[in-house]
Design a protein with these regions (language model features):
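Beta-strand-rich binding/interaction modules
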Residues: 105-108, 116-214, 327, 331, ...
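Tryptophan-centered motif/residue detector
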Residues: 14-15, 112, 156, 432, ...
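Hydrophobic alpha-helical and helix-loop surface patches within well-folded domains
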Residues: 1-126, 130, 135-136
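Long, ordered, helix-rich scaffold segments
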Residues: 23, 50, 202-552
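Structural beta-strand/beta-sheet cores of well-ordered domains, especially the beta-sheet scaffolds
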Residues: 59, 94, 119-125, 132-134, ...
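A generic secondary-structure signal for well-formed alpha-helical elements
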Residues: 2-8, 64-72, 80-88, 98-105, ...
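K/E-rich alpha-helical interaction surfaces of small helical-bundle regulatory domains
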Residues: 71, 177-180, 247-254
Length: 552
């Protein structure tokens, strides 16, 4: 993470980290496979290499650095190498080095390594216009997880700022009497440590209503619960100085609309909310700035993100339909700006992998995607022309991806031409297979079964399995098909792979980790497939471990 941040854009890398964490680790924490970063026990060591151990584990080190500061962290790393190089070091050995370098007791922080689950941090705010104060009530809660019904409060570093109604950042002046000396020093650098279940803070000398800019830089792996108005989110999307908060404001606004649409698809659309959201995006696009960041702002939350937000009784078809409609809304509302971006960002210069060039390509391809979502008849020729004339694989794959989201003849022509051109390149054919497996349309499962019978596919090739079958398992709409065909297909593949490659079989089986979130019919169908797998006497220890925990 840090290497890429230093070499490319720190903001874009951080957003990518957060997307990965939420998609993989938050989902793991919310299901039957939840476990701590350092589990007390395990049944199969091959199942130890999880998003929790790796992705959440990285976030703990990031939090540690934030809590003790860069200098103390650097000294602690050096001390760790001096003390522990060549030894079987433990988490306790690791943390002891940072206690020595910082003078801080990290026993409470160590609970992050022991306790499973994603904490929720709630911020309740009250502004007193007469007193010119803002009162914040902070609270944290971690839900029960398998084997850990009771949770303790954690040390949560909450990076925070205040934004005025004009979009300017305001100084943090708090009632310092409520803090000890260490906490007052942390507040000066925009940090509040939430170490108990609740904490009350009052900011003073605020002559205007403010917007709270919380969890800057995604300072902790938590779910933030905050009752921001649409107006507040629009302000943050346009003016917040922290890129993560700006991006999160757009994500939160879109999520609000998408969750409402998925929960009550027949109740009508929130036209005023959609108009306000698209206007906020228009202002962000018109402001210019880093093209790569603008591309992130324009990318809606994924179907997995929306399902996780809904939490239970999830209907993947309703989520897909709502997301497609909102993508089309954004494309129509911003069609003039998007078409201008698409044309202005075209380049005849030789391909360069530098960050600036990559950002321009990302924004141009995002514009193409939204334009095609809004008007398939107009966007498809643009995508086909880009596919034909692209000077680099990024642009050609982006155009093919857009075409694969349509059901046009141009899609099939482009797929055939792509295959003929790159049939001898294994890595590119992996991508070709994956694109087809992730098509959201009916008939995708039949297409995948057909591709499995071609010479390009072999169950003995893990990369091919990950690309085609793993791609389908990640296809939220088709894997969760209401007739259970997606569950049956992946379950059959798990059983076929298990005797030969249980590690890959387990990765496919992880697609079932959120089965309890589905609406009742899908729940029953997914459970039936899991119990069928569980009933096979010859299962490997790897698959047996995951299926037993999934059904526990």
């Amino acid at each position: 993470q840090e290497f890429t941040s230093d070499q490319r854009s720190r903001a874009i890398q951080r957003i990518a980290d957060v997307r990965t964490l939420r998609a993989q680790q938050f989902s793991e924490d919310a299901g039957p496979l939840a476990h701590s970063v350092r589990p007390d026990t395990y049944r199969e060591i091959n199942n130890f290499y999880t998003a929790t151990v790796y992705e959440k584990g990285a976030e703990l080190v990031r939090m540690l650095k934030m809590l003790i500061g860069d200098d103390a962290f650097s000294r602690g790393i050096q001390l760790y190498f001096e003390r522990c190089d060549g030894t079987a070091a433990t988490v306790e050995d690791f943390l002891a080095c940072f206690e020595a370098s910082s003078g801080r007791d990290l026993q409470h922080f160590a609970l992050w390594y022991e306790q499973a689950g994603t904490p929720s941090v709630t911020i309740a705010a009250s502004y007193d216009q007469d007193a010119k104060t803002l009162s914040l009530e902070l609270s944290q809660e971690t839900p029960p997880t398998p084997g850990q019904p009771d949770k303790k409060p954690l040390v949560i570093p909450l990076a925070i700022g205040l934004i005025g109604e004009s979009g300017t950042e305001l100084p943090l002046k708090a009632e310092i009497d409520a803090f000890d000396g260490a906490s007052a020093a942390e507040l000066k650098r925009g940090l509040i440590e939430l170490t108990s279940a609740r904490r009350h803070i009052v900011f003073r000398d605020l002559g205007e209503r403010v917007v709270i800019s919380a969890l800057r830089g995604f300072s902790a792996p938590v779910q933030l619960v905050q009752s921001a108005s649409d107006e507040d989110l629009s302000l943050q999307c346009a003016f917040d100085p922290d890129p993560c908060v700006r991006w999160q404001a757009a994500q939160t606004y879109a999520t609000r609309l998408l969750v409402a649409a998925a929960r009550a698809p027949a109740s009508g659309r929130n036209h005023s909310g959609i108009a306000s959201f698209t206007e906020a995006l228009r202002k962000a696009v018109s402001a210019g700035g880093d093209p790569a960041f603008t591309a992130q702002l324009l990318t809606l939350p994924s179907e997995t993100d929306i399902a996780r937000e809904i939490g239970d009784n999830v209907d993947p078809d309703a989520i897909y339909d709502g997301r497609q409609r909102l993508r089309a809304d954004v494309g129509r509302a911003l069609s003039t700006e998007l078409l201008r971006l698409y044309r202005d960002l075209a380049s005849d210069a030789p391909y360069s992998p530098d960050a600036a060039s990559a950002g321009r390509r990302a924004l141009r391809n995002t514009a193409l995607d939204l334009l095609t979502s809004a008007d398939e008849a107009a966007g498809t020729p643009l995508a086909r022309a880009q596919f034909d004339t692209a000077s680099n694989m990024t642009d050609r794959i982006a155009a093919l991806t857009v075409l694969c989201l349509t059901e046009s003849a141009a899609r099939e022509d482009a797929l055939e031409e792509f295959y003929k051109r790159y049939a001898g390149d294994a890595l590119i054919i992996d991508k070709w297979l994956s694109l087809q497996a992730t098509m959201p349309h009916p008939g995708t499962l039949d297409r995948v079964r057909g591709l499995m019978r071609t010479e390009q596919f072999s169950m003995a090739n893990p990369n091919r399995v990950r690309a085609l079958i793993g791609g389908f398992a990640a296809n939220q709409r088709q894997f969760n098909a209401p007739d259970g065909s997606g569950y049956d297909f992946i379950g059959e593949c798990v059983l076929l792979l298990d005797p030969k490659n249980p590690h890959v079989a387990v990765r496919l089986l992880s697609a079932f980790r959120t089965w309890r979130m589905m609406e009742p019919r899908r729940c029953r169908l997914a459970e039936a497939m899991l119990r069928r797998i569980q009933g096979v006497a010859s299962l490997s220890p790897d698959v047996r471990d995951i299926v037993d925990r999934s059904l526990a």
